[in-house]
């Protein structure tokens, strides 16, 4: 066994030194100044501490994976460093002030702060990376947050079988930057209020890139209204394509197989007893326009039908096993490519995991639904929604001599909005 050398030093060692980079990035944004303009009632605690200091403090906590208000007490051990690193002007607030101030901040600065974040991205020359085919992926999905054994407002049974919330999130680029999210009660169906979320997401994405977008959705969002939104965007030459896994509903797998068996041009035999049919057809979709006029269009439908008569172990089936996968798309990409691109949509699960585990935001800190919206996202229709959080993955580029240092930082930026979106800096 090697000997362990212990050295004594007078140097000051600081564990969360990466907060310095977060403070530098926030310093380029005007959102703190705009937040400070919100009036503070004389009835609130520590009113001499500005709203910007409150938000900057909480940002520092979240960057360390500590979303609970009480974690701010750890900063009191070295207040000078945290004030310097995060740009806090007056003092670090108490846990009580954090909780109270979150409930106080309104939504009047929503547009201003959204624009401030977009401007910050532009100043940092950020553009989400596209796929090899030129499309910038936008993955949208619902991910339940487990808040079991709690009496928090809005907590209810999710489709995962536990009590919690069901926020919807949108990631852009191959990096998986979180561009938009919205907190929802656990029992809410994933399609409810999604059309408005899609429109807002497209608008936010368009401020980050002019490249063609490829939006990917699960079968829970197989709805004509969603398809109509994407088609109308494509008609406006907005370069919006989509892949949505179809919900077969009452469609018969046997009828699908019989309809493609004779006409399919791409038939594969991976092994004995297994046949895969891949191809395309067109199905009509009717959706309503903004003036309530109905419009019917033929949408390209990709199919992947697998017929198994023998399992992998050589056992014969009495009745063939049929697996059906169909996908809506308006892209002109090859059939195989469309299927592979949808399967890559599953990578967004790892982004969910970063938020819920690495960042420890899955179990929200407050018992109030509105207060938890401060931390994650807010519903447009919630009249007294307060401050919310942008969760992003930041890459801060530093040029020194002729070297480039890329430092990836899990970064949180607050917004006062009804809906939350997240930005990423590269």
Predicted regions, residues:
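An anionic, glycine-rich sequence signature occurring as long contiguous blocks
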Residues: 2, 241-357
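Short, conserved catalytic/metal-binding motifs centered on acidic residues
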Residues: 57, 72, 89, 94, ...
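Short, solvent-exposed helix-loop connector elements
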Residues: 39-46, 335-342, 359-374, 390-399
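Short, hydrophobic/amphipathic alpha-helical patches that form generic packing surfaces
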Residues: 19-24, 53-65, 329, 376-390, ...
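Dynamic "connector" segments at or just before major functional cores
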Residues: 1-163, 169-189, 194-208, 233-236, ...
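Domain-level cores of phosphate- or acyl-group-handling catalytic modules
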Residues: 188-251
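Short acidic (Asp/Glu) and glycine-rich catalytic loops that position anionic groups and cofactors
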Residues: 1-3, 34-38, 78-82, 317-323, ...
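A short, flexible helix-boundary coil/loop motif
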Residues: 385-426
